[in-house]
């Protein structure tokens, strides 16, 4: 996998513009993961919900024999721009703890709500594991 970063472009913070995947391997597509825990309970804090969603993503990737380094795309659905911005430090810490220094192409969308009204974030993932 090769990250696309034209030399004349400024490097984005927290994501990459794109990746190229070349060769055989395994694609993994995860349904959107929200910030609800295994019991379906939600914390009210945006950073805590993002942390839970990211942990769920890492767990599912592990089930597929993959890790954060295999993520090639994230799509975030957020219910509040102000809460997201206020939770920046906590979200950054959660990212570092779960995804490390992996910054795949990402899209963030602000929406009016999610199916479960308690959810503040939902994250979809596409990953690719090269053949060995």
Regions found by a protein language model. Give the residues of each.
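N-terminal presequence-like segments and the immediate start of the first folded domain
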Residues: 1-72, 78-132
